């Protein structure tokens, strides 16, 4: 994921579940331009990343599912993300938070993945109070519209739905259940569902829409992947 975003990953090892070992592992990362960790950001006794970031902590937890237990701070003067240890939550928070930062640090003008509209083929249950990024498969229907079929399980432990997902259906904080047939916004993860005529396609001179409504100006360079 780091390579696809344009970065160069450097693995600094696995940290033990104790404060001294974690600090030693983090010290090995101090020459990086951006530090990423996975795990240790929730509420367990061994979740030590929040404390490690205490002096430079910017936020801990976001109102998004999956991916609530995520942290951002600074270590050694470098931006540092503490991503959830759950694989699905880690993948989603990387896509939403880390990938745009890497691309912005590289000076790329379109950090966000494109967002399109699609017709929901099955209902998605959701309670207001937290945004939901629901994994879905996309296909183009006989009507020419893109249709989004949500994964059967939206559990953050269901990796199969993430592997098969072509996009993430965006249901905002205040939204409730989404019904079949409803038009929804989808963040595209796989290019084959992008038509060059559709808003959000990263063509020369175009603008890519950010997942939550803001946009980034196009630069004329042609990205190979979203």
What are these regions (language model features)?
Residues 1-37, 42:
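Phosphate-binding glycine-rich loops and their immediate beta-loop-alpha structural context
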Residues 19-20, 43, 91, 178:
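Loop/helix-junction capping segments adjacent to catalytic residues or to phosphate/diphosphate-binding pockets
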Residues 21, 48, 97:
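Residue-level recognition of oxygen-bearing side chains
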Residues 34-53, 57:
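Glycine-rich beta-strand-to-loop/alpha-helix junction loops that act as flexible
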Residues 52-205, 212, 225-226:
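Flexible glycine/proline-rich
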């Amino acid at each position: 994921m780091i390579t696809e975003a344009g970065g160069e990953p450097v693995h600094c090892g696995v940290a033990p579940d104790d404060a001294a070992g974690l600090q030693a592992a983090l010290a090995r990362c101090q020459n990086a331009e951006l530090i990423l960790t996975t795990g240790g950001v929730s509420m367990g006794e061994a979740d030590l990343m929040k404390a490690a970031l205490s002096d430079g902590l910017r936020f801990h937890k976001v109102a998004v599912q999956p991916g609530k237990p995520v942290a951002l701070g600074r270590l050694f003067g470098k931006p540092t993300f503490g991503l959830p240890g759950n694989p699905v939550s880690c993948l989603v928070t990387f896509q939403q938070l880390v990938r745009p930062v890497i691309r912005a640090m590289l000076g790329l003008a379109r950090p966000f993945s494109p967002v399109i509209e699609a017709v929901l083929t099955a209902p998605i249950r959701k309670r207001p109070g937290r945004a939901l990024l629901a994994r879905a498969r996309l296909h183009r229907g006989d009507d020419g519209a893109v249709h989004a079929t949500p994964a059967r399980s939206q559990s953050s432990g269901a990796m199969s739905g993430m592997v098969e997902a072509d996009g993430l259906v965006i249901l905002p904080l205040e939204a409730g259940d989404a019904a079949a047939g409803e038009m929804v916004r989808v963040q595209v993860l796989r290019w084959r569902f992008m038509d060059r005529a559709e808003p959000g396609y990263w063509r020369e001179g175009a603008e890519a829409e950010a997942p939550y409504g803001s946009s980034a100006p196009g630069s004329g360079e042609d990205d190979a992947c979203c």
